Amino acid sequence: NPAKRLARALDGRLVFLYAGAGPLAAVALRWRQQLHENAKLLAHSAVVPELDHNEIVGWERPGALHRGIAVVVLYDPEDAPEIRTRLVLTGEYARRQGAAVHEWEAPAGPRLARLASAVQFGDYLSLYLALLAGADPTPIPSIDEFKRRLAGRRGTPA
């Protein structure tokens, strides 16, 4: 089970999701949100080429922090060659800086089918991570608490 294997590799780490600026940019955002809500796990997502102009500089600072990060590079069969090259080089750079780097390739096929498969994979990934952490993926107590506190402020709708 590929989603379960990836979940085991990501368990206990801060997860960075990197994708091209095409269709998988939305998938990376979806995966991030599912990891937050279901697995109760901090995650971050960014897309190339923009991340290679800014975020990559954040990897320069040496230290133990990078060893607690797992990068998942998401590839799409329709990625332009220059985008794929950027993703490969960015993953290699993160690995040299101490992060664990994993790759995920969307299956070939029509775009809608690829996106549906990618979303499904991320949903399963988030559920497996929740199970590994012993977390119930359904309740969202921090959001509920935030809404209660927000509603307690005069004139602020929840």
How does the language model describe each region?
Residues 1-158:
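A SIS-like phosphosugar-recognition module
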